[in-house]
């Protein structure tokens, strides 16, 4: 099993909170669309003193499944339409568990 963790810091915008909730909702639907994605947890930071706005924790069975998930059209649509416009500054780590 591979664990994929991403932390996002987004630029400020008038509708940032609504956009973060939309990103969370859409990411949480991906296991129903991408069979290789076994589980996903998305959290919105509630502590304004912290740097990161959103965290993602995803689980796939094999390393190649991580590529399948990352390149899947449903995932890419979220990245292109929701994450990229907010100019995300991500930090990522992947490891076998």
List each model region and its residues.
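Short S/T/G/P-rich N-terminal loop/turn motif that feeds into the first structured element of a domain
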Residues: 1-53, 61-71, 94-97
């Amino acid at each position: 099993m591979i664990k994929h963790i991403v932390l996002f810091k987004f630029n400020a915008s008038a509708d940032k909170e609504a956009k973060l909730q939309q990103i969370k909702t859409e990411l949480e639907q991906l296991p129903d669309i991408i069979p290789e994605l076994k589980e996903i947890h998305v959290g919105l930071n509630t502590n304004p003193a912290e740097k990161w706005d959103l965290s993602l924790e995803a689980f796939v069975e094999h390393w190649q499944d991580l590529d399948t998930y990352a390149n899947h059209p449903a995932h890419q649509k979220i990245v292109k339409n929701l994450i990229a416009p907010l100019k995300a500054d991500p930090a990522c780590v992947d490891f076998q568990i």
